[in-house]
Amino acid sequence: DDFSTMPKTKRAIRKKQMATEAAASAASDKYFFFYSTRSPFSNFHPASFVDEEGNLFFCSEQYMMYHKALLFEDHEIAELILSEQSDPMQCKIAGRAVRNLDNDIWLENARQIVGQGVHLKFSQNPSLKAKLLATNNLTLVEAAANDRIWGIGFPASKALTVPTKIWGSNWLGQVLMNARERIRHEDDKERL
């Protein structure tokens, strides 16, 4: 989201949300909470990168939805998603319209697909890569109150007040931490 074009009330809500995430992360020596699209860890955060076929993506949400459409051989929706140039929500909406979707197959493949997109995003953007590596060994937590699969099902303001065993799956946090380890390993190999 571009703060300069956002209505004043929406800007205030986003600033409060980011402050809450920062406060919750600061209160923990174990977790780093994120959710806002201004966070580099969000799939909606703008970050250009190219996949193995030379396709240009403007965010990892676009990559995810494009590959979701390809998984189910919906080339029309895939092209629609790839043609989007700046709005991750439009990609998400198009991804929900994928024909022949089998949710079990999607759930079996989603983490691998998103993991590859996240790796490309961070490995091709040095400033984002530095931010990911700066999280050291903290557990990255998507504090999405309405998502118990990719997030934990709680906002950052509530996350530390409930037992972690009742958190959602946090798949996005997991793929980010896997990407962090993969990038560290690649960097170590380059130094040798």
Roles of regions detected by a PLM:
Residues 3, 7-192:
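Charged, low-complexity intrinsically disordered segments
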